Amino acid sequence: MAFRIASSPFTHNRQTTRQIMIQVMLACLPGLMALTTFFGSGIIIQLVIACVTALVAEGVVLTLRRQPLASRLGDGSALLTALLLALSLPPLGPWWMMVLATAFAIVIAKQLYGGLGHNPFNPAMVGYVVLLISFPVQMTSWSPQQSLLLHPVSLTDSMALIFTGVTPDGLTLTQLRATVDGITQATPLDGFKTGLRTGAMTAFHHRWDWQASAGWTWANIGFLLGGLYLIWRRVISWHIPLSLLAAMLIGAGLGHWLAPVVSAPPLLHLFSGATMLGAFFIATDPVTAAATVRGRVIFGALTGLLVWLIRTWGGYPDGVAFAVLLANICVPLIDHYTQPRAYGHR
């Protein structure tokens, strides 16, 4: 009998990288369906643009690096990055913004560092932040919910707005938004920030009706369900999502208790913006998050605290992307001080 000699590691995980990526993308479906239902088919168009750009950009870089195309493109990591960007960017934003964000995420934030497993920062969030800093007006121009528009945006209208900037009837996104009053056209976090600047607090919380915020609430519920599925399937651990949400809620609760005029209530933080998407799908990236159990708890808590701080006092209404990237910077330090001590060593 022949015995094969192999080196460590000897542990075995039945799930391949491709299988993990597919499960994460499937878990995003409830949130994607909610966003599409409330904000229109523009998200699907942006998703197609992002996927094509990600595959082309990754293929070009892999060819230049003389890496195998089939196995690298087939692992699903590029498509997951594209999906996260499509879920994060405004659904009716210009097509070139999605192309720029996706190409930057794949080429600069991922492949420049050596590809999957070597990037220190979450590629999707790097692409998002590049656009947010470079084009803040376009990045904060989310369309209102379909139910609030006098002229609901069809698939044809969405394609025209994304590729030409106007609908077949000659309406721009700004004109479509103008048909909705100033409260309902903003996201919940946008509305809160605007109210702080204009002195319209604290009555904002009572005037914000369910109809205006239903899309964001259901989207977050969808991502929460998808995240619980990933925990059940043991694709991700519970440490980062739970510590992130707990730290954010503790900060928001204390802030709202001490200064309700300048701090949003905890439930607004929990079910607005990219809270659940960030907690279960972005912060849990195994490449850029902490490696140890204690480290994951610290990493998640740090991210959640930063989300609350940026949302409350920062210049942008949602701080998930910046919080994740800032926490990514701290990962080497967290891993250094949370590594388990080897037996026999002090």
Swiss-Prot record:
GO annotation terms (biological process): electron transport chain; transmembrane transport
Uppermost EC category: translocase
CC annotations in GO: plasma membrane
Transmembrane regions listed in the UniProt entry: 20-40, 42-62, 69-91, 120-140, 212-232, 242-262, 264-284, 290-310, 314-334
Residues that bear FMN phosphoryl threonine: 187
Subcellular location: Cell inner membrane
InterPro entries membership: NqrB/RnfD, RnfD_bac
Main subcellular location of this protein, as a coarse class: membrane
Sorted UniProt keywords: Cell inner membrane, Cell membrane, Electron transport, Flavoprotein, FMN, Membrane, Phosphoprotein, Translocase, Transmembrane, Transmembrane helix, Transport
Acetylation listed as a keyword: no
EC number of the protein: 7.-.-.-
Membrane topology: Multi-pass membrane protein
Top-level taxonomic group: Bacteria
Cofactors that this protein relies on: FMN
Protein purpose: Part of a membrane-bound complex that couples electron transfer with translocation of ions across the membrane.
NCBIfam families: PRK00816.1 (NF002011), rnfD (TIGR01946)
Quaternary structure (record): The complex is composed of six subunits: RnfA, RnfB, RnfC, RnfD, RnfE and RnfG.
Family in the record: Belongs to the NqrB/RnfD family.
Name of the protein this chain belongs to: Ion-translocating oxidoreductase complex subunit D
